[in-house]
């Protein structure tokens, strides 16, 4: 008898009206689309190793020094050695965005509403993710890429060498001195013109401005967009991004706010937006993401010209 009432609640929520589903998970198809846009728009996600998270914490087993091999004769006993491991733990933090909309949106379906808001939600997410993970801006995480590079003095000031390509080569050498290869760069959009002008001894461009992937020194380079990059702190970051871990928990939750005052949104009179006064509602969308750079020496930063390294 119970089988008659075996209703798919997620399907019901997806196809229902927003006014009847004031809290819940973003419909599956729209949530997948938002995450696809986030992955496409976030430089840190495109470069890093992304791990799924089934809970808010995930522990990793990382071998920092492997066991040694020994030459032995036919009658000699093989020596033993001990591998060294670390067990870093990544913790997912909640990331949220609040988007004001007219009350009429409550009469639309959840599928249509989140299909329409998909670009705005995704952009807010990937901008915040890049700013936090790269620079520690408004970040809940204990480390950022910039902080680990700065902590071991893996930094060079732009203009130290005769040209940008030589500065970047020296930057790569800092990582290579630690026995690691650079496998990618990230930088701000304003550096593109300087990169396009770089040539090798045969006149060939060092920067390849491909359609699907851009490369510098035969490694992918990602340009951080929409204000996430802090040009006062860095021109470019080099790294072995296998040592940058990002964890993502499945699902994007939402909540409809009706009476809130949004202090991050100001009206023409300079006052914060009061939803009830403006006959509006707001949609709060949240996701959970973790971040952990697991090897400090895997990253190096090119500081802007004039930057004083302390």
Regions inferred by a protein language model and the residue ranges of each:
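Alpha-helical scaffold segments that mediate packing/assembly in large oligomeric complexes
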Residues: 86-89, 97-177, 301-302, 308-310
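Extended oligomerization regions of viral-like shell subunits
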Residues: 150-281, 287, 310
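Short helix/loop capping segments that flank catalytic or ligand/cofactor-binding pockets
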Residues: 68-71, 109-110, 194-197, 292-294
């Amino acid at each position: 008898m119970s089988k008659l009432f075996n209703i798919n609640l997620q399907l019901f929520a997806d196809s229902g009206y927003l006014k009847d589903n004031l809290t819940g998970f973003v419909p599956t198809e729209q949530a997948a689309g938002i995450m696809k846009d986030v992955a496409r728009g976030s430089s840190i996600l495109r470069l890093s190793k992304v791990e799924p998270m089934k809970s808010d914490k995930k522990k990793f087993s990382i071998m920092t020094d492997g066991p040694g091999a020994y030459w032995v004769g036919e009658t000699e006993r093989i020596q033993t050695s001990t591998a060294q491991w670390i067990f870093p733990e990544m913790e997912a933090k909640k990331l949220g965005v609040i988007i004001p909309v007219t009350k009429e949106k409550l009469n639309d379906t959840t599928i249509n509403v989140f299909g329409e808001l998909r670009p705005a939600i995704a952009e807010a997410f990937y901008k915040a993710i890049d700013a936090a993970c790269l620079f520690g801006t408004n970040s809940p995480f204990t480390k950022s890429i910039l902080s680990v590079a700065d902590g071991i003095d893996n930094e060079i000031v732009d203009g130290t060498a005769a040209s940008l390509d030589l500065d970047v080569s020296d930057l790569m050498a800092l990582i290579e001195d630690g026995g690691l290869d650079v496998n990618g760069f990230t930088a701000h959009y304003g550096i593109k013109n300087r990169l396009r002008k770089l040539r090798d001894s045969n006149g060939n461009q060092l920067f390849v401005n491909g359609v699907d992937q851009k490369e510098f020194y035969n490694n992918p380079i990602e340009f951080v967009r929409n204000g996430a990059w802090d040009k006062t702190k860095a021109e470019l970051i080099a790294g072995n991004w296998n040592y940058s871990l990002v964890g993502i928990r499945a699902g994007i939750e939402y909540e409809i706010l009706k009476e809130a005052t949004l202090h991050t949104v100001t009206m023409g009179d300079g006052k914060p937006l009061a939803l009830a006064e403006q006959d509006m509602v707001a949609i709060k969308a949240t996701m959970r993401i973790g971040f952990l750079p697991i090897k400090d020496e895997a990253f190096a930063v090119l500081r802007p010209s004039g930057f004083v390294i302390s």
